């Protein structure tokens, strides 16, 4: 029994993380091919099958080259949480290691999902559907800024790490605070989970100017690939929290303007002073800006984690 445990302990999960646009997908596929491993995604948006272009899902050739898990595995209509990901990802890793894999590659930019996998989570309460419907209605009518201010009053610590332009994140944090009377941050991950395998985190980075240039170019590529049409097809689902995110909310705001629904917040850029999104060009500018801001927040979140080995991905 001890020998079996020692052998399992030699196995490793390598987590490739980093800001949006840094090149995680290509790096992870290269590692996976080297190890003979699949890629386990830890991206909270790529998990939804209706969101392809705006989430930079690996293309057909990349998906054909290496088996991927947690890509397009669920619907935007589902309430998918980090707690559920923790359970399902651990179950998958256990199965893959028992199949004989010595090294596994995990890849993504969702810090909360990564923390859930590595450290575990306290038991979050299940969603209260009535409260969620009320908050979703407020999100649409008042904008994410109003919900973020309420969250700040209840849990300022969470506001330091949550992407306050992401309606899904803000709504869930506020929902937990209102349901439990506890701060959402009090449910955060803590280093308590033990593993029968080693974990190594590799953080990818690039010089800021190069990273931002890549982000801007990638947004233009998304537009060329049909992002506007993808978002148009999601209008019936636009109330879903998963769609209150960069790349989708800005185009929804443009659609609203075209339909005569002028709004400066909510479905739009969510930053004071942005004004209505009157053109596609303005929507593109805001997606680029909000993506750069998101990359900056991701890096700030991970700089506190001293276990990450940072590599310049040139």
Where are these regions (language model features)?
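Phosphate/pyrophosphate-binding catalytic cores of soluble transferases and nucleic-acid-acting enzymes
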Residues: 1-314
